[in-house]
UniProtKB/Swiss-Prot annotation:
Glycans are attached at N108. The keyword Glycoprotein applies. This is Probable dolichyl-diphosphooligosaccharide--protein glycosyltransferase subunit 3B. It comes from Arabidopsis thaliana. The lineage of its organism: Eukaryota, Viridiplantae, Streptophyta, Embryophyta, Tracheophyta. Component of the oligosaccharyltransferase (OST) complex.
């Protein structure tokens, strides 16, 4: 009886060990299958970024047992928000693809299968957005092998982590995953065929260009070009165009009280709209052109009466333009500009 009991215990132990080993091999095979499928999906993308949907998130994250043999860096995108330039979604997605391609090019061995770059599009994967708890874009998150709760925001990339675009993203990846991204490999601005065509055109056009330069018949010899260029630069400089470009200021705003009304002038010294800058630039340009006309053209008019009338008209228009600029400055800043007349005039 004792022998029979020992035999039963031995058989039970063998069965337990067999099932354990079978489960272990099964998990190993499952992980290997997931890795192979991720590698296959990555190979179909030019930049190595895998397009995932709700089914892919379920397969590679929620249904896969932890710890997973890979990490996923996920870029959350929404095509309907691409028109909002302040979000910079298209630019960040392009830089994200550059980091992915650089990582893939610099890690051809086993290190290349430890991290995969993925993207999720809102219109096709709304459930995944809810699963991750993403309610604002841009959003980039690293899902490490041990993460089981996808709402864990410990792997979220801060705005400072993509301030320098691809370079900052690469630093984030290297810091969090301990993997080496390697040098960022940006695509050239021009392909080799394009460079060849440009060089051929330059070689063909060089003799004709030299001939026209020697004869003084190029566009650079036209004084009207330089005059137009000077006016163009003057207008955009006094209009504060560089300020608007650097700060990405809109041309106008929508009135909060009346959505059908547009605001072209913003009251406050800390902000200038594009239309407002162009209006001020136009007034300054009018004064500058009148001054140039008076000092270079009007002095050649032989009729004294005509000279005086045109001079008075130019002074009146200039005074009106400067008055409008001063009024706008007073309205925006609250600081008044008052004339000080000589005491003998009072």
């Amino acid at each position: 009886m004792a022998l029979k009991s020992k035999l039963v215990s031995l058989l039970f132990l063998i069965a337990t060990l067999s099932s354990t080993f079978a489960a272990s091999f099964s998990d190993s095979d499952s992980d290997s299958d997931l890795l192979n499928e991720l590698v296959s999906l990555r190979s179909t993308s030019e930049s190595g970024v895998i397009h995932l949907d709700d089914h892919g998130i379920s397969k590679f994250l929620t249904s896969a047992s932890t710890p997973r043999p890979y990490s996923l860096l996920v870029f959350f995108d929404a095509t309907q928000l691409h028109s909002k330039n302040e979000l910079r979604l298209q630019e960040l997605r392009r830089e994200f693809g550059i980091v992915s391609a650089s990582f893939l090019a610099n890690n051809n061995g086993s290190e290349g299968t430890k991290l995969f770059f993925c993207e999720i599009e809102f219109s096709k994967s709304q459930s995944s957005f809810q699963l991750f708890g993403v309610n604002a874009l841009p959003h980039i998150r690293l899902v490490s092998p041990s993460i089981s709760n996808l709402r864990d925001e410990s792997g979220q990339m801060d705005q400072s982590d993509y301030s320098r675009l691809a370079e900052s993203m690469a630093e984030f990846v290297e810091q969090r995953t301990k993997l080496k991204v390697g040098p960022i490999q940006r695509p050239p601005l021009l392909s080799k065929p394009q460079i060849g065509i440009i060089v051929a055109l330059i070689v063909i056009a060089t003799p004709f260009i030299i001939k026209r330069v020697l004869k003084g018949e190029t566009i650079l010899h036209d004084t009207r070009l330089w005059l137009s260029g000077a006016i163009f630069i003057y207008f955009f400089s006094v209009a504060g165009t560089m300020h608007n470009i650097i700060r990405k200021m809109p041309m106008f705003l929508q009135d909060r009280n009346d959505p059908n009304k547009l605001v072209f002038f913003y009251q406050g010294s800390g902000m200038q709209l594009g239309a407002e800058g162009f209006a001020v630039g136009f007034l300054y340009t009018v004064v500058g052109l009148l001054l140039a006309f008076v000092t270079n053209v009007l002095v050649r008019v032989k009729n004294i009466t005509a000279q005086r009338l045109i001079m008075l008209l130019a002074l009146f228009i200039s005074f009106w333009a400067v008055k409008k600029v001063v009024y706008l400055d007073n309205w925006k800043t609250g600081y008044g500009i008052h004339p000080y007349w000589p005491s003998s005039w009072r």
